[in-house]
UniProtKB/Swiss-Prot annotation:
The gene is rlmC. Its EC number is 2.1.1.189. InterPro entries: 23SrRNA_MeTrfase_RlmC, MeTrfase_TrmA_AS, MeTrfase_TrmA_CS, SAM-dependent_MTases_sf, U5_MeTrfase_fam. The lineage of its organism: Bacteria, Pseudomonadati, Pseudomonadota, Gammaproteobacteria, Alteromonadales. It comes from Shewanella sp. (strain MR-7). GO terms for molecular function: 4 iron, 4 sulfur cluster binding; iron ion binding; rRNA (uridine-C5-)-methyltransferase activity. S-adenosyl-L-methionine binds at residues 219, 248, 269, 316. This is 23S rRNA (uracil(747)-C(5))-methyltransferase RlmC.
Length: 384
């Protein structure tokens, strides 16, 4: 826990993303724990509330996704970021990535050079290749590779060089082009063009098969995420719920860990691609009493579905939290328990202030984002 990660990028002032990388891991965790305890102090005045020990993973080589800005020129491309001083910095050797991912990122720099694709220049609004997005599946070490382009003009060049790349790296299973024509700081556009027959990457956390498609959200630290899902499964099992809701369900990680063949599960997520992935997982697992729907979670809770109230509700919202309206809906449904997984303890605390008739009984910090201010929290609320 006292391990220090030595990062040359940070030392040279080229990248400050891991702002706490100079602190020992134990010190980072202590600061995060203190912040969490202070934010949730108003909700732990009952003797039953437990702050469980934080869950940690490796301090380097843990990240499964790289979002690289493509800089430089067609003959000398750079995958990385613009440093605070304005220079193009290659981040292919970023210590957050496993060694095999670092090697592939270096190969992708050569790929862009061989294909002769001009990087997009924000200052001149010219060029083609904006980003390269690379996602790694830990279960098999396989990859999904996405090229974010301004237009279709460079697709032929990618297709020309792709066979050699995939022969060298057969673990690349999914390749796509995302079209983002707008001159704005937007990561991706609406249109996705697949250059491979396969359109999804398979992952497995614990005994649950999960799938990743280009636009579906997926946890970036598989090692700790697996522990997060397993903990959720154990906490939910204590209540033996007859029915479950999983709101903001993404690809179904929480719900599928907590589901069983005889328990009806309803999963709600606004991103249709993620729902398609969740349905594939449920089918593979032989879960017949599961339905996943691409809807807004707040709207769903206010609709006709509100007449069929579940015994336990899982929520895993984005950083903005679930909001006052959904808090009121959950209070009215009065399930046995609410399991809240949060990536923003500030909005978690705000939401807890709007949920009525429940007491906080368990809290656990999961350090999915070492060296940063961010962390995940699992909070269990039990009906009074």
């Amino acid at each position: 826990m006292s391990t220090l990660v030595q990062c040359g990028y940070f030392e040279r002032g080229q990248c400050q993303s891991c702002r706490h990388i100079k602190l020992p891991m134990a010190q980072q965790l202590a600061a995060k724990t203190q912040e969490l305890q202070q934010l949730l102090a108003p909700f732990v005045d009952n003797a039953e509330a437990q702050f469980l020990p934080p869950v940690v993973g490796d301090s380097s080589g843990f990240r499964n996704k790289a979002k690289m800005v493509v800089l430089g020129a067609a003959h000398a491309p750079v995958l990385g970021i613009v440093s605070p001083s304005g220079e193009a910095v290659s981040l292919c050797d970023c210590l957050l990535y496993p060694a095999d991912m670092q090697a592939l990122l270096h190969r992708l720099e050569r790929f862009v050079q061989q294909a002769g694709i001009p990087p997009y220049r924000v200052d001149k609004a010219k060029g083609e290749l904006k980003f390269i997005l690379l996602t790694r599946s830990q279960v098999r070490g396989e990859y999904m590779l996405r090229f974010v382009l301004r237009s279709r003009d460079a697709i032929a060049r990618i297709e020309r060089e792709l066979p050699a790349l995939m022969a060298e790296y057969p673990q690349i299973k999914v390749v796509s082009v995302n079209l983002q024509p707008i001159h704005m700081a937007i990561l991706e556009g609406e249109e996705e063009i697949f250059l491979t027959e396969n359109t999804r990457l398979e992952e497995r956390f614990n005994d649950v098969p999960l799938f990743i498609r280009p636009k579906s959200f997926f946890q970036t630290n598989p090692q700790v995420a697996a522990k997060l899902y397993q903990t959720a499964r154990e906490w939910v099992a204590d209540f033996a719920p007859a029915s479950l809701w999983d709101l903001f369900c993404g690809v179904g990680g929480f719900g599928l860990h907590c589901a069983a063949k005889d328990i009806p599960l309803t999963g709600i997520e606004i991103e249709a691609e993620a729902i398609a992935c969740a349905k594939m997982s449920a089918q593979l697992m032989g879960l017949d009493k599961v339905q996943f729907m691409a809807l807004d979670s707040t709207d769903f809770a206010k609709g006709d579905a509100a007449q069929t109230k579940p015994e336990l509700i899982i929520v895993n919202p984005p950083r903005r939290g679930i909001g006052e309206s959904l808090c009121h809906s959950l209070s009215e449904f009065a399930p046995k328990a609410i399991l809240y997984s949060s990536c923003n303890p500030k909005t978690l605390a705000k939401d807890l202030g709007h949920i009525r008739g429940y007491r906080l009984t368990k809290v656990q910090l999961f350090d999915l984002f070492p060296h940063s201010d961010h962390f995940e929290v699992l909070a269990l609320l039990v009906k009074d």
